[in-house]
């Protein structure tokens, strides 16, 4: 990244390949990189919640293992948040298949807003809370919660595609039952999670409780217990 004043927190979620070994070798030669491991597989959003607690910077953003960021992504987003009252800066993304071909959406467009690209002012987590203990979709729920709390003007969207996302056969967006389809449509489990989370935001937790949401996630096998992380 062209913006070099960054802290990189990486967590290995009990991978079965040599990911942890590779990450540790990088951290050995780059003091900005700190490496953690899950005690037990716990999914991306529990890990994010844990790493947010460890982070020292004023801005938080994320990078999934199968994504590639434009070299100027961090710099552009930092500049927006430093010079704007917004609390989140997002960018577009392009999905690329393993053969290098771009995956278009149902409207024949190649780009879409990328929720994973969100750069968030750290103090927002103290107000809104962290991500739900879900295997999928918790970043979208967080995004919608911020809009309801702070208004749409609190989020700035950069139209440039600053992330390439691998559209391969692995990953939660491709697994049967949790998939986001190539044309932009999503699985039944994702739709139901989105619906119940929206009802909770509108009606309040006295009507739609966290237990209700957890029950739906559990029925689909999407609820994940927190196992913690270790260095």
Language-model features: where?
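Nucleotide-sugar donor-binding/catalytic module of glycosyltransferases
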Residues: 1-230
């Amino acid at each position: 990244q062209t913006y070099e004043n960054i802290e990189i927190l990486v967590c290995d979620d009990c991978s079965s390949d040599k990911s942890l070994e590779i990450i540790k070798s990088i951290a050995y030669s780059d003091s900005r990189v700190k490496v953690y491991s899950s005690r037990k597989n716990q999914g991306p959003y529990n890990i994010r919640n844990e790493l947010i607690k460890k982070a020292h910077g004023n801005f938080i953003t994320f990078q999934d293992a199968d994504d590639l960021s434009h070299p100027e992504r961090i710099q552009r987003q930092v500049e927006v948040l430093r010079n704007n009252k917004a609390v989140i800066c997002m960018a577009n993304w392009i999905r690329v298949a393993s053969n290098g071909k771009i995956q278009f959406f149902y409207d024949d467009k190649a780009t879409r807003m990328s929720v994973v690209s969100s750069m968030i002012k750290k103090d927002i987590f103290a107000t809104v809370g962290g991500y739900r203990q879900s295997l999928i979709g918790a970043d979208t729920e967080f995004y919608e919660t911020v809009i309801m709390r702070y208004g749409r003007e609190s989020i700035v969207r950069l139209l440039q595609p600053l992330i390439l996302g691998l559209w391969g056969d692995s990953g939660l967006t491709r697994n049967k039952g949790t998939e986001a389809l190539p044309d932009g449509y999503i699985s039944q489990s994702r739709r139901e999670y989105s619906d119940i989370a929206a009802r909770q935001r509108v009606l309040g937790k006295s009507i739609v409780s966290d237990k209700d949401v957890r029950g739906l996630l559990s029925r689909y096998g999407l609820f994940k217990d927190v196992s913690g992380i270790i260095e």
